[in-house]
Amino acid sequence: MEKKYVIILSEGKEYLCCHEDGCYYDVSCPMRSFTEGEEDFEIMDSGQNRHGKTYPYHKRKLKLVPGFYPNGWLALSLEVPKTGEAYTVLTVNLEDFPAFGIPDKAFVDINNNPEAMDFLIRYNLAEDTGYRRRNGCVEYPMVKLNLPELYRISPVSYTH
């Protein structure tokens, strides 16, 4: 059975949620749940008209494509809209263990894409957590991803 995702607004904050057994749970933190009649929340329109949206990056118009690394951690790539050709991957997978749910954290590949951090923050796709992890001679910044916005951009990416 395919999971159905919705965006929940609760106390001014949006959460990407999955619906199961009469309850909505946050995909990045399944212990956070919303039950109709018990909590005050609103199901938001996903605004899926963002699907073909492009972003300027390196003086090109590119499409953001969320995806997943083999261990379940989120990967953010940019591709050429007309051809679907991969342009670059904005994140790097530094996790050894499989993901639990859909993680709302990722490490930004500032080694190959020095502008990636500014790009993600500028377009409200992520925010800096302040945490850095060293791998080799590079300290990669961790970001908190805006999962509801990433879902709006590419709902099909979440059907894995």
Regions found by a protein language model. Give the residues of each.
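Basic/aromatic-rich interaction segments and small domains that mediate binding to polyanionic partners
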Residues: C23-M31, P81
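Charged, low-complexity intrinsically disordered segments and flexible loops
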Residues: Y55-H58, P66-G67, G72-L74, V80-V89, ...
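Short, mixed-charge low-complexity intrinsically disordered segments
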Residues: M31-I43
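Short, compact, well-ordered microdomains
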Residues: N111-P155
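Acidic, aromatic-enriched beta-alpha/helix-loop junctions
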Residues: P81-N124
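Short beta-strand-centered aromatic/proline hotspots
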Residues: Y15-C17
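A short beta-strand micro-motif
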Residues: K4-S10
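Conserved small/polar residues in nucleotide/adenosyl-binding loops
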Residues: T159-H160
